[in-house]
Amino acid sequence: DRVFIPYKEVLDVYHAGLQVPDEVTLMWCDDNYGYIRHFPTAEERARKGGNGVYYHVSYWGRPHDYLWLGTAHPSLVYQQMSLAYERGIQKMWILNVGDIKPAEYQVELFLDMAWNLEAVKQQGVAAHQRHFLEREFGKNRADRLQPVMQEAYRLAYIRKPEFMGNTRTEEKDPKFKVISDLPWCEQEINERLAAYRQLSDKVEQEWHALPAQKKDCLLYTSPSPRDMRRSR
């Protein structure tokens, strides 16, 4: 099948009147941060080529990338992909994931929704995540880990760890290469650091108690800050 992907500025070209052959699949994209930019109209849904989606849970590029941790909020993935399916985006789903391990849970959620959306809907995203944690770490540890994971996703939804100092990789003025350009007060920054430190301590405690074959799984699938990763 042939596919047309109106990514970034190409969507503006499409909206300006670009004609795409009817048999070509239209693959709609998110904004690189989890929000789909265009849902097909009735006319686009009736096309022979059908509709697909190209969705990010990891992104390299401007204005800010996020590659370090798997911080894409599962509830946002669930909401956007459910809406995509309901709006007729059903032929092809592609996930931009970058490093697979940090986003292993988001990948599983995305693929399970692509395979059987109704089953995931009936289960609910929280129960789906719970099943993942129980399978990988056992019931008792899942009881302790799920609140940690949910709080980490909540914090990252407000502002991802990679965005705390921004990604001015080509900035010539050195004063902008540090956190001084973050529009938060000192109190907000300290509260954020304390919240992540608390999460990190909880994850590290579980990590030390895990059998060797499960340590890497927790290390890479928990959206935890850097100091926990030093414990290796």
What name fits each language-model region?
Residues 1-48, 215:
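Gly/Pro-rich turn-and-neighbor structural signature
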Residues 2, 192, 229-230:
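Basic side chains
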Residues 28-34, 40-195:
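Structured mid-domain segments that build the active-site/substrate or prosthetic-cofactor binding neighborhood
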Residues 189, 193-196, 200-203, 210:
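Long amphipathic alpha-helices with heptad-repeat character
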Residues 206-219:
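Short, solvent-exposed, charged loop/turn and helix-capping segments
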Residues 220, 225-231:
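Single conserved hydrophobic/aromatic residue that forms the stacking wall/gate
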